[in-house]
Amino acid sequence: MSEVQSSAPAESWFGRFSNKILSLRGASYVVGALGLCALLAATMVTLSLNEQMIVALVCVAVFFIVGRRKSRRTQVFLEVLSALVSLRYLTWRLTETLDFDTWTQGILGVTLLLAELYALYMLFLSYFQTISPLHRAPLPLPANPDEWPTVDIFIPTYDEALSIVRLTVLGALGIDWPPDKVNVYILDDGRREEFARFAEACGARYIARPDNAHAKAGNLNYAIKHTTGDHILILDCDHIPTRAFLQISMGWMVSDSNIALLQTPHHFYSPDPFQRNLAVGYRTPPEGNLFYGVIQDGNDFWDATFFCGSCAILRRKAIEEIGGFATETVTEDAHTALRMQRKGWSTAYLRIPLASGLATERLITHIGQRMRWARGMIQIFRVDNPMLGSGLKLGQRLCYLSAMTSFFFAIPRVIFLASPLAFLFFSQNIIAASPLAVGVYAIPHMFHSIATAAKVNKGWRYSFWSEVYETVMALFLVRVTIVTMLFPSKGKFNVTEKGGVLEREEFDLTATYPNIIFAIIMALGLLRGLYALIFQHLDIISERAYALNCIWSVISLIILMAVISVGRETKQLRQSHRIEAQIPVTVYDYDGNSSHGITEDVSMGGVAIHLPWREVTPDHPVQVVIHAVLDGEEMNLPATMIRSAQGKAVFTWSISNIQVEAAVVRFVFGRADAWLQWNNYEDDRPLRSLWSLILSIKALFRRKGQMIAHSRPKKKPIALPVERREPTTSQGGQKQEGKISRAAS
């Protein structure tokens, strides 16, 4: 008789060993403390290269042992370990690698060192920001709606099409809030008659100022003078809110009268250029997820949440106290938050997406938007430096400093990519060290930086993708960085173009030509290095140096090729983007037939539903009514079934008036749980991420017209978090609500 085998996989010897270590009460912390002390001592004393190699291997082993446990203490430990390993590397770089033979070597070597110092500075600041993310949850509103505050919803627009703006306006009009306590305003800097007529037809209010001074900030300031609500919800004209936006977010504004701003994530229901153009795009977290999933939660702990221009609630009293929205820079949002915090106001972040908008369609548009952000943040750094002036706590200063100086990445990024060319083309050794020493000090530093980031970022950002996102725009931002630092008043606000279509596949040469040139030069350098390794008679040190720089150039070339691949723009013909959603519905036709089903995807163009129905072809469509109950509202939506076969039916909406259109908007975009799957991605694994980056390059070599087979992450249910607060007793004996803990520094 055969033995019954366990279905659980056998645990490796390493797993059993590390679990044994971690299971000992307090042992992990003792071992950790001793290990960090030993590492610090090894950094400060002179050890042989072989002994330093042992130190490096021990650090890697400690990472794997401690990293098996998932807890906040583990993350802090790994961040401290990574910082010490990086300090060890920096000590070595400053004391043993700056011995140059020529002025050229010296200049190139110091240039690389400065780039590394910037990278280490940003690494340490990022660890500081994310040391204890707050993970704020919603607070309940008072039971009596009469106690809820009044809210003005501002939707600023300039030259965007009405077809985009109307969805946001209709979504805002559908927000669950007492009708006498909310007003929706279209702030039209384009002064268009069709927008005024639409506002009158749908029940929104319309404000148009006589000029366009100070762009978006001026538009908002003008509206403040002509409205009276206690709070202001700002929505970019393409950010369509869910019905529960105010009920989920306003609890904090009511509970704490010192909160001037509550920011929520920016989520996009359409793919950005990286998602749309790369074969692995839909399996990779969007670029903005790192900021809204990790960094803003970390900022919230330090009371340094940034205002991001949309999907945010602001207290009118706080805005009026600082004289309105900041107009000195092109990023009025972050500057406004900084000014409020200088006045002693608090800010908050709620990591629940309550609205969704359109991502930039084209790569060149994406680059232009980031150039404006970079210009604006560097302007704030120059004209209102957070490290100077009064009113800010240390944590706030450092968080703002990190945000502003992060946009200096362009020059260091170019230096890192190009550095191997100094040796491959000109035999200039810009790190005065043997390849073995580089491996002993640099590789552990890189390993811990990458591996620790993977633990911290989880599924919000994958390893090596930050390099791709930065490299896409680095060569464009070099000039912006230098000019803005020297002349901070230069530059103007540019509206980001959205909502377009791409009728044919094309290669965006405008957005990629600098990196194409860069990649050609890098490939030539690699060929030069390979030629030397294969055909030249090299001594062992030169051979290792060529091998090291060839590996470096291969990594640079992979990043550059991935960046160029994003420029292969795929066709985008849909005006209405499909959104995956599983909604129970019942379909009725006018002959009395009915069937229950589940939606597969929804859009403003129609809906696909899994349901048993007779075969229907486009030549013989069927008029139906789709019945659904969402957030307590019964909906009966008229539609036309244009195709039905094999248990799946496709419908187009039959929108006859603005009331039906508003109901469809609520059905498609207004569901309270519509965007809770926004981070349904697997946790980062660096080697898998590197492989996906290599796979993304194949987009460059696909045949014209060949579609990319995107594989979306599988959906899993996510519960909406609710803050549970126990009442505490004040000194006067009265009950008061407990407050969330955050840094006091």
From Swiss-Prot:
Membrane topology, record value: Multi-pass membrane protein
Residues annotated as transmembrane? 29-49, 106-126, 153-173, 407-427, 430-450, 468-488, 515-535, 547-567, 649-669
UniProt subcellular location? Cell inner membrane
Region feature (Catalytic subdomain A)? 147-240
Residues at which substrate binds: 236, 238
Q: What is its main location?
A: membrane
- The UniProt record lists the keyword Transferase: yes
UniProt region (Disordered), positions on chain: 708-745
Task: Show the active-site residues.
Answer: 189, 333
Keywords from UniProt, A to Z, are: c-di-GMP, Cell inner membrane, Cell membrane, Cellulose biosynthesis, Glycosyltransferase, Membrane, Transferase, Transmembrane, Transmembrane helix
Which cellular component appears as one GO term in the record?
A: plasma membrane
Report the GO molecular function annotations.
cellulose synthase (UDP-forming) activity; cyclic-di-GMP binding
Q: In which pathway does it act?
A: Glycan metabolism; bacterial cellulose biosynthesis
Q: Does the keyword Coiled coil apply?
A: no
CDD domains, A to Z: CESA_CelA_like
- Give cofactor(s), names only: Mg(2+)
In terms of domain of life, where is this protein from? Bacteria
Q: Where is the composition biased (Basic and acidic residues)?
A: 736-745
UniProt-listed Gene3D superfamilies: predicted glycosyltransferase like domains, Spore Coat Polysaccharide Biosynthesis Protein SpsA, Chain A
Task: Give the reaction(s) catalysed.
Answer: [(1->4)-beta-D-glucosyl](n) + UDP-alpha-D-glucose = [(1->4)-beta-D-glucosyl](n+1) + UDP + H(+)
Family from the record? Belongs to the glycosyltransferase 2 family.
The domain comment in this protein's record states: There are two conserved domains in the globular part of the catalytic subunit: the N-terminal domain (domain A) contains the conserved DXD motif and is possibly involved in catalysis and substrate binding. The C-terminal domain (domain B) contains the QXXRW motif and is present only in processive glycosyl transferases. It could be involved in the processivity function of the enzyme, possibly required for holding the growing glycan chain in the active site.
Relate the protein's function as given in its record: Catalytic subunit of cellulose synthase. It polymerizes uridine 5'-diphosphate glucose to cellulose. The thick cellulosic mats generated by this enzyme probably provide a specialized protective environment to the bacterium.
Q: What is this protein called?
A: Cellulose synthase 1 catalytic subunit [UDP-forming]
State the organism of origin: Komagataeibacter xylinus
